[in-house]
Amino acid sequence: MKEETFYLVREDVLPDAMRKTLEVKKLLDRKKAESVADAVQKVDLSRSAFYKYRDAVFPFYTMVKEQIITLFFHLEDRSGALSQLLQAVADSGSNVLSIHQTIPLQGRANVTLSISTSAMEENIHTLMNKLRKFDFIEKVEILGSGA
């Protein structure tokens, strides 16, 4: 898979959907909206547009200073799946800070990982693309980030 390239772009040249996606993320981070549906309604953005851009558009300051990222996974319940996931995260140079796994129900489990990316040897999107290739990972997304 091709490595992702990032660009620094002035806000006034971004399409409306991307600017509004950033507004929705800000509302959710600051608890000014109770849900994604509430936030997109406040900024007049479709939910599909928000989900299209939410993992692709970030304020510049977050790309510079963020070192802790929380990831959410939906996994098939297989022996060794969590171990393989954690090994891939460790191989990227990330440090696992916390792990939360639900009890598997109907062959599926949810896992939330908080990782430190300060020593990471690749960017978070490259790691996410590698993780998506595991056949036992049904879903991976960034839940949040912080310093």
From Swiss-Prot:
Family membership noted in the UniProt record: Belongs to the UPF0735 family.
Protein name: UPF0735 ACT domain-containing protein RBAM_024960
Listed CDD domains: ACT_PheB-BS
UniProt feature coiled coil, ranges: none
Pfam families assigned: ACT
The organism's taxonomic lineage, starting at the top: Bacteria, Bacillati, Bacillota, Bacilli, Bacillales
HAMAP family: UPF0735
Sequence ranges assigned to domain ACT in this UniProt record: 70-145
InterPro entries associated with the record: ACT-like_dom_sf (IPR045865), ACT_dom (IPR002912), UPF0735_ACT_dom-cont (IPR008310)
Domain of life: Bacteria
SUPFAM superfamilies, per the entry: ACT-like
Organism name: Bacillus velezensis (strain DSM 23117 / BGSC 10A6 / LMG 26770 / FZB42)
PROSITE patterns: ACT
